[in-house]
Structures are given as structure tokens and as C-alpha cells.
Design a protein with these regions (language model features):
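Acidic, PIN/NYN-like endoribonuclease modules and their adjacent C-terminal/linker elements
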Residues: 1, 28, 43, 70, ...
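Short, well-structured N-terminal submotif of metal-dependent ribonuclease cores
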Residues: 1-37, 50-62, 120-133
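Short beta-strand scaffold positions
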Residues: 4, 37-38, 71, 89-92, ...
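Amphipathic alpha-helical segments within well-ordered protein domains
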Residues: 7-10, 47, 81, 99
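Alpha-helix capping/helix-boundary segments
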Residues: 8-9, 42, 76, 94, ...
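Alpha-helical elements of the RecA-like P-loop NTPase motor core of helicases
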Residues: 20, 48, 78, 114-115
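Short glycine-/small-residue-rich flexible loop motifs, especially phosphate/cofactor-binding loops
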Residues: 47, 61, 95, 114
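Acidic catalytic patch
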Residues: 63-85
Length: 133
């Protein structure tokens, strides 16, 4: 199971430097049978970002359809609130949910979240295409 953070999924609806890399990475993971998962917080964050950037809701929903969205648990919120460090609320909630779900990997592009995830014992990835030599 691969937990996907908003910083990664947003690249699937907004053209950014790593957009092709993360799309390829997640497509390959799905082809291998890995499930993509996130908390319902992703639904809210992605739709709000879509509204701000005038991204059609249909495109946002198409991307979300490939991700298993799980409900937040009260324990996720409590655990996120108790986390040491300087994570923003949403990042702490995503990390708490990934830990509860025992995700094998967290895909994100937020440096603070990635650092906290590694400190919590999770494997992490921020896919980028490496130039060929």
C-alpha cells in the first residue's frame, strides 16, 4: 500500500516539473498491484486547490478515482496533534493516517513531511526523472 500526499497528487492535475515523474511512478505502482491510498483530507485539499487554480472538477475527480480514500479517525487527529516537530496540520494528519494504515511507502514532495515520515520509520519517495548520461 502506497500512501499519497497532496503534494504528490496535486502534480497529477497541475503541470509541474515532477508531474510526469510522479504520474509514471504511480502508474507503474498500480500496474504492479500496489494500492494507492490517502485520507479523505486529500479529497478536500485537491478540490480546494482545483477551485483556486480553475481546474475542472471532473479532472480532479478522475485523479481521485484511482486512490482509495479512507475516513479520518479521531485517533488520527489526536496522534497528529501530539506529533513532535513543526509539521503543518494537514501534513501531520496525512502522516498519522499513513502510520495507522501501515503504509509501505509515503509519496510526497514536502521536505518537512518526508523528514518526519522517515523519522517515524516509513519509506518515502519523491519521484523525479534522472537525466540519462
Amino acid at each position: 500500500m502506497i500512501y499519497v500526499d497532496t503534494s504528490a497528487v496535486l502534480k497529477l492535475v497541475v503541470a509541474e516539473e515532477e508531474s510526469a515523474s510522479v504520474a509514471d511512478y504511480l502508474s507503474e505502482a498500480a500496474a504492479r498491484g500496489d494500492s494507492l491510498v490517502a485520507s479523505m483530507l486529500l479529497y478536500t485539499e485537491l478540490h480546494c486547490a482545483g477551485h483556486r487554480r480553475r481546474i475542472p472538477a471532473g479532472l480532479v475527480n478522475d485523479v481521485l478515482a484511482g486512490i482509495n480514500l479512507v475516513d479520518l479517525a479521531r485517533s488520527d487527529l489526536m496522534f497528529a496533534a501530539a506529533m513532535p516537530g513543526h509539521l503543518r496540520s494537514a501534513d501531520a494528519i496525512h502522516l498519522a493516517t499513513a502510520i495507522r494504515l501501515q503504509a509501505a511507502l509515503l509519496v510526497a514532495y514536502d521536505t518537512e513531511l518526508l523528514t518526519a515520515a522517515v523519522e517515524a520509520g516509513l519509506d518515502v519517495a519523491s519521484p523525479t526523472h534522472q537525466p540519462e548520461h
